[in-house]
Regions:
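Helix-turn-helix
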Residues: 41, 45, 49, 53-83, ...
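Amphipathic alpha-helical interaction segments
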Residues: 41, 62, 83, 113, ...
């Protein structure tokens, strides 16, 4: 979830120039009877641009061009780039919400189902974690409505678990961090696959040269095993299996720890 903003007074809701600093979802959409665009449409276009060309390509001018309008007219709908980023974040978080009829009744399986779906969103949009949730994200980006829906769903499936609220929150934090780390790693692997083959080959040869030095005996032993072969390292299916296995170990291990602590 994005970082929240908690203004302390009504005065904090307006900037020095009188601009409305409330989150975009608290500001009314354009009052025209037939606005040309909705905020959802603007967000969808911005996400599509990021998917095709990377987050760096997302700009008010570019989104306006894709919508067939002028940059100035876009400011009728949103105040600027930070609003655009907030809408993009909300659009992606909407994708993480699992339809109720697809949620298993068993709470563990429900947690896994939500985790799989969330990971899938980040894999489809590999730019999102760094751009919307990393250190480059605007510090004032509020927690979006769909991020609240995602968190609410995670808490709802844990109601039938034997965990108390503190343990539930800890489990969700661990699972969410695992999803984030695994998605970032998968994004790096995808980037590597799309790199110039000559550069990949040069990097592999450098690694083999280090192994031949004899200074890394444990890594050398790993490289001789099927799990350490170059093809396996870049295998997407292997990554999927690793995610499933790691997620199960996290949930089962956490529940075992809670039981032992009682």
């Amino acid at each position: 979830m994005s970082r929240a903003v908690h203004p302390g007074t009504d005065a904090a809701l307006h900037g020095k120039k009188g601009e409305d600093l409330r989150p975009i979802w608290l500001r009314p959409e354009p009052g025209s009877r037939r606005p040309r665009f909705t905020r959802d449409q603007i967000a969808a276009v911005a996400v599509a641009v990021a998917d095709a060309e990377g987050f760096e390509a997302v700009a008010m001018r570019r989104v306006a061009t894709e919508l067939g309008t002028s940059p100035m007219s876009l400011y009728h709908y949103i105040a600027g780039k930070e609003d655009l980023i907030a809408l993009m974040d909300d659009a992606l978080m909407a994708e993480t919400v699992v339809p109720d009829d697809e949620l298993p009744e068993d709470w563990r399986q429900a947690v896994v189902t939500i985790a799989r779906r969330t990971r899938g969103v980040f894999l489809r949009h590999p730019w999102a974690l760094a751009a919307l949730h990393g250190h480059n994200a605007p510090p004032s980006t509020p927690i979006s409505p769909n991020a609240w829906r995602h968190f609410e769903q995670q808490l709802a499936v844990l109601v039938t678990s034997p965990l108390d609220i503190g343990a539930q929150l800890d489990l969700l934090a661990i699972v969410n961090d695992f999803i984030t780390g695994h998605a970032l790693r998968a994004g790096e692997m995808e980037q590597r696959r799309n790199t110039d083959p000559a550069l990949v080959q040069a990097a592999l040869e450098f690694g083999r040269e280090l192994l031949r030095s004899g200074r890394y005996p444990f890594i050398e032993a790993l490289s001789r095993s099927p799990a350490g072969a170059d093809a396996a390292i870049l295998d997407e299916q292997h990554s999927e299996e690793q995610f499933e296995r790691g997620l199960s170990l996290l949930i089962d291990g956490w529940c075992t720890t809670q039981h032992q602590d009682r």
